[in-house]
From Swiss-Prot:
Gene of this entry: ARC5B
Highest taxon in the source lineage: Eukaryota
Entry-listed glycosylation sites: N91, N100
Record-level GO BP terms: defense response
GO molecular function terms listed in the Swiss-Prot or TrEMBL record: carbohydrate binding; nutrient reservoir activity; toxin activity
Subunit structure: Monomer.
Gene3D superfamilies: 2.60.120.200
Record function comment: Seed storage. This carbohydrate-binding lectin has toxic effects on bean bruchid pests.
Disulfide bonding pattern of the chain: C167-C203
PROSITE patterns for the chain: LECTIN_LEGUME_ALPHA (PS00308)
Keyword tags: Disulfide bond, Glycoprotein, Lectin, Plant defense, Seed storage protein, Signal, Storage protein, Toxin
Protein name, as recorded: Arcelin-5B
Annotated Pfam families: Lectin_legB
Signal peptide annotation: 1-21
Length: 261
């Protein structure tokens, strides 16, 4: 028995050392500046107010038709390392504003995509997908704040959601909105909590996601929205703040530690 515990302890220490070699990431943007570690694509810019303005506006401040912009953290994020899978937590605040409160398009995605991936199709594809059919090579997982269908979607490798929950973006148009997204790798649990801060209305949704099967070892994390094809359906997408942290926890090492104890 003693020798078995010693062997488990030795294996635990080896795995712990390996876990510590994985890259964990943490950053915080209480507001945004042009020299921040961000990759801006399409129509994305940093506004004079320190906001991440993801889709275009006209000279008078109205949302621009058929606009798409993407913003990703410039350093790749490690999601998996051998038996190790990262958990993560991200918080951000956004405002989506449309001219027509009864209908708008298309929404904002928070996405984990392939490193150095170029922008994809506009409109309902949100700049992260190319087709309505499964794309195994897309290696993308996204939480979509779907303003066209008034819901929160979970998308894996194509635009059709495998989980969704109603959330009335039209009713709370223009409100500052706080979001927390968490992923717990110990039970493959992806959760979204959304709070319209003026109306005090909340939405939430969760699902089981085996992230290590859906994305690459290293990913880029960030935002990708698109606006509608007519002036009546366009909207602006501004992110006011964003923080992110990832942490590795080795499932096998936890089992060995329980055996030692």
């Amino acid at each position: 028995m003693a020798s078995s515990k010693l062997l488990s302890l030795a294996l635990f220490l080896v795995l712990l050392t390996h876990a510590n070699s994985a890259t964990e990431t943490s950053f915080n943007f209480p507001n945004f500046h042009t020299d921040d570690k961000l990759i801006l694509q399409g129509d994305a810019t940093i506004s004079s107010k320190g906001q991440l303005r993801l889709t275009g506006v006209t000279p008078n401040g109205d949302p621009r038709v058929d606009s798409m912009g993407r913003a990703f953290y410039s350093d790749p994020i490690q999601i998996k390392d051998s038996n190790n899978v990262a958990s993560f937590n991200t918080n951000f605040t956004f405002i989506i504003r449309t001219k027509n409160q009864s209908i708008s398009a298309y929404g904002l995605a928070f996405a984990l995509v392939r490193v150095n991936s170029p922008p994809q199709k506009k409109q309902e594809f949100l700049g992260i997908f190319n087709t309505n059919n499964p794309e195994p090579n897309a290696r993308t997982v996204a939480v979509v704040f779907n303003t066209f269908k008034n819901r929160i979607d979970f998308d894996k490798n194509f635009i059709k959601p495998y989980v969704n929950e109603n959330c009335d973006f039209h009713k709370y148009n223009g409100e500052k909105t706080d979001v927390q997204i968490t992923y717990d790798s110990s039970n493959n649990d992806l959760r979204v909590f959304l709070h319209f801060t003026v109306s005090q209305v909340k939405c939430s949704v969760s699902a089981t996601v085996h992230l290590e099967k859906e994305v690459d070892e290293w990913v880029s994390v960030g935002f990708s929205p698109t606006s509608g094809l007519t002036e009546d359906t366009t909207e602006t997408h501004d992110v006011l703040s964003w923080s992110f942290s990832s942490k590795f926890r080795n499932k096998l090492s936890n089992i060995l530690l329980n055996n030692i104890l």
